[in-house]
Curated annotation (Swiss-Prot):
One of its GO terms (cellular component) is extracellular region. This is Class I hydrophobin 10. SMART domains: HYDRO. Residues 1-20 form the signal peptide. Induction: A CT-rich motif, which is often found immediately upstream of the transcription start point of highly expressed filamentous fungal genes, is present at the expected position. Its main location: secreted.
């Protein structure tokens, strides 16, 4: 019981740290964001934070979820919500619109993300 409480508090702390971290900005020389039309509608997400999987907060969170950081390709989005509407139109995403391969962790984390333009 105590271990479960500690794990829950630790996970909450990691999420708080990850959300408080600065947003991801693509490094120079990276490719332009993919158009939203090239992403399946169900995979479009609006994430508060997008970071490399190897960043400290994200790597810690992935470890808690039992995901090997080396297995993650692309970026990781934190606290994401689905983008609704045709082609992302009228989505109201003021954060980081991304297209993610794995959204199976609810709104907590999305894996294998690439930036998209809406």
């Amino acid at each position: 019981m105590f271990a479960r409480c500690v794990a829950t508090i630790f996970a909450s702390l990691l999420v708080t740290l990850a959300v408080a971290s600065p947003e991801y900005y693509a490094p120079q020389g990276s490719t332009a964001p993919a158009p939203a039309g090239q992403c399946n509608v169900g995979n479009q997400q609006c994430c508060n934070t997008v970071q490399e999987a190897s960043s400290d907060p994200v790597a810690g969170l992935l470890g808690l979820l039992g995901i090997n950081v080396q297995d993650v390709t692309g970026l990781v989005g934190l606290t994401c919500n689905p983008i609704t509407g045709i082609g992302g139109l009228n989505s109201g995403c003021d954060a980081s619109p991304v297209c993610c391969e794995n959204n199976s962790f609810g709104s907590l984390i999305s894996i294998g993300c690439i930036p998209i333009s809406l």
